[in-house]
């Protein structure tokens, strides 16, 4: 409720809740709970549902059922999806259902210490950080899959110039 109050104070009339919650929004019961709580606020609260069951990146949720119960789109926000075939299948289903997918784009195998972009500041403090390539490789994959499938996708929190150019 505090998020909705802050949104209303900032002039927002509609927000979309992300699905990376505990429990995750990977089933109708949780989705309906989020939407019911949203109805108690002064703004229009929508909710995304998860792309995969338990946000584990292994099995797609029942996207058709979740959309029928009010999911505005799908995401495993905060968790990058590593399986390209699964992402393609999710995109094909999203096209069929006419819903957007939103992706957290960073390849964890390329990151030594997350939380800061790798660059002069991170190197100065010996932190390491996330190289731009960790973001770029998943953005490239998902942009290409979206072009091939026709899916509507959102790339969350872009920080790499190369990623911006790919999205454009």
How would you label these PLM feature ranges?
Residues 1-38:
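Metal-associated gating/positioning segment near the N- to mid-region
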Residues 54-58:
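Conserved phosphate-binding/catalytic loop of the ribokinase/pfkB sugar-kinase fold
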Residues 59-168:
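Histidine/acidic residue-rich metal-binding segments in metalloenzymes
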Residues 36-51:
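A glycine-rich helix N-cap at a beta->alpha junction
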Residues 16-17, 47, 103, 155:
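Hydrophobic residues in well-ordered beta-strands that form the structural core
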Residues 12-17, 43-46, 118-127:
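Gly-rich Lys/Arg/Thr-decorated short loops/hinges at beta-loop-alpha junctions or inter-strand turns
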């Amino acid at each position: 409720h505090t998020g909705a109050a802050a949104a209303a104070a900032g002039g927002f009339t509609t927000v979309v809740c992300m699905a990376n919650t505990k429990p995750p929004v990977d089933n109708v019961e949780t989705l309906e709970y989020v939407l019911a709580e949203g109805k108690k606020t002064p703004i229009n609260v929508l909710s995304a549902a998860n792309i995969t069951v338990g946000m584990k990146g292994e099995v797609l949720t029942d996207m058709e059922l979740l959309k029928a119960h009010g999911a505005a789109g799908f995401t495993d926000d905060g968790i990058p999806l590593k399986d390209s075939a699964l992402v393609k299948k999710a995109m094909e289903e999203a096209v069929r259902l006419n819903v957007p997918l939103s992706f957290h784009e960073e390849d964890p195998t390329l990151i030594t210490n997350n939380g800061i972009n790798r660059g002069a500041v991170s190197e100065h403090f010996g932190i390491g950080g996330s190289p731009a390539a960790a973001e770029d490789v998943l953005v490239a994959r998902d942009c290409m899959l979206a072009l091939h499938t026709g899916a509507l996708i959102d790339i969350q929190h872009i920080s790499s110039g190369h990623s911006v150019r790919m999205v454009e």
